[in-house]
């Protein structure tokens, strides 16, 4: 299996990921875990994989449903300090390619929770007018 697009740079990390905008009935599907913020369905691009292939794979892994891409929504870049144990206090530079997905009319995630490494994550529908902490 190919490695994630995650590169150690001096005392920091370069991370290249994809995110999916999955909207239905005025809500967007987000991911949560044991921390106090939510983030988009998605994950790291694997070396040798295109961003489009990565977002389709990540959506399938996290929702259990195969979806097509509608279009690239935007590119997001951010510097932040990691809070996971292996990345605590490391400066991370992250580039995210965020795609709008074509959501099937009868879409419902196969599972509401999944494992990402050793942490359990869960899917949350959030109203577009709701004020939430995001990552």
In which residue ranges do the predicted regions lie?
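Active-site-adjacent beta-strand/loop module that shapes the phosphate/pyrophosphate-binding cleft
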Residues: 80-110
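Conserved Nudix-box catalytic region and its N-terminal flanking loop in Nudix hydrolases
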Residues: 24-62
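A structural signal for short, well-ordered beta-strand segments
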Residues: 20, 72, 97-101
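Conserved hydrophobic "DFG−1" position in protein kinase catalytic cores
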Residues: 22-23, 30, 101, 125
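Acidic, metal-coordinating catalytic segment for phosphate/diphosphate chemistry
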Residues: 1-19, 25, 88-90
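NUDIX/MutT-family hydrolases
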Residues: 98-100, 110-135
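A generic structural micro-feature
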Residues: 12-14, 87-95, 115-120
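A short coil-to-beta-strand element that immediately follows conserved catalytic motifs
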Residues: 66-75
């Amino acid at each position: 299996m190919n490695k994630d697009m995650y590169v150690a740079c001096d005392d920091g990390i370069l991370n290249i990921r994809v995110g999916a905008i999955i909207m239905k009935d005025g809500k967007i599907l987000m991911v949560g875990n044991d921390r106090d913020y939510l983030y988009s369905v998605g994950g790291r691009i694997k070396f040798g994989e295109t961003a489009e292939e990565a977002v389709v794979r990540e959506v399938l892994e996290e929702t259990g449903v195969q979806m097509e891409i509608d279009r690239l929504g935007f590119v997001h870049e951010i510097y932040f300090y990691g809070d996971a144990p292996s990345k605590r206090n490391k400066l991370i530079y992250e580039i995210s390619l965020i795609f709008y997905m074509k959501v099937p009319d009868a879409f419902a995630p196969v599972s509401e929770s999944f494992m990402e490494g050793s942490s359990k994550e869960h899917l949350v529908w959030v109203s577009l007018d709701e004020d939430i902490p995001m990552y």
